UniProtKB/Swiss-Prot annotation:
Name of the protein described by the UniProt record: Cyclin-G1
Organism: Homo sapiens
Tissue expression pattern: High levels in skeletal muscle, ovary, kidney and colon.
Protein origin, superkingdom: Eukaryota
SMART domains: CYCLIN
Subcellular localization(s) per the UniProt record: Nucleus
Function: May play a role in growth regulation. Is associated with G2/M phase arrest in response to DNA damage. May be an intermediate by which p53 mediates its role as an inhibitor of cellular proliferation.
Gene Ontology process terms (BP): cell division; G1/S transition of mitotic cell cycle; regulation of cyclin-dependent protein serine/threonine kinase activity
Induction (UniProt): Activated in breast and prostate cancer cells. Activated by actinomycin-D induced DNA damage.
Keywords attached to this entry: Cell cycle, Cell division, Cyclin, Mitosis, Nucleus
Alphabetized GO MF terms: cyclin-dependent protein serine/threonine kinase regulator activity
Amino acid sequence: MIEVLTTTDSQKLLHQLNALLEQESRCQPKVCGLRLIESAHDNGLRMTARLRDFEVKDLLSLTQFFGFDTETFSLAVNLLDRFLSKMKVQPKHLGCVGLSCFYLAVKSIEEERNVPLATDLIRISQYRFTVSDLMRMEKIVLEKVCWKVKATTAFQFLQLYYSLLQENLPLERRNSINFERLEAQLKACHCRIIFSKAKPSVLALSIIALEIQAQKCVELTEGIECLQKHSKINGRDLTFWQELVSKCLTEYSSNKCSKPNVQKLKWIVSGRTARQLKHSYYRITHLPTIPEMVP
């Protein structure tokens, strides 16, 4: 499929994909650091996978509350995991670290008119630290990520892979795969630290490949194989991460899974704050329930 794409749009997409693949290994979390977090015991003194996952769910709630793009959330998770995989963060500082990463991502991705004031962000997040605390932590985060805020994320690959597959479909079949569903699935994966150990391209292709299987879009199977080959993704790696994604989505769709809670954010905004906030702050985008997937 990749070899026969001849339209101008397709060539542009392919050029973007090649650029992302070239940059992919830069600005990613240290896998060894993530493993240390995963192996840490929950004694209240050390960062654990559970605490990290809860923090990411809070960032997802904020993303939905403000109506920010998935790209913003994906970048915030990248920044958070890059920082956590380098630094020994005490649990009591995690909220400030997480919100700092989130604010950096918001200012990097969102339009300036949609960027909230730091005071509003702290209040809505229900934290007790000050704007000065947030700004100091922001500087620390920037220093530890070498001032490289922009990073290659799984969301960027998800967009490009999806667009390239769409180019290969007849017009009447282009709605067979829903991009919003893919976004929702990626958000669920971001809420598990294990997926930050996957290469962004592998995670994105795993999500799309599973959805194609679930929707029985056999005409796209060859397209997935071509994208896998072009991206130089090992078949065993793809299968390994597909199985983990499938397990994650199955658990996410069950009642046992703790889902992001946007409702708690809605209720704490006072009348005075509400009058000061922009209308776009109430544009809540709920994360849809993901039906159980068949491995």
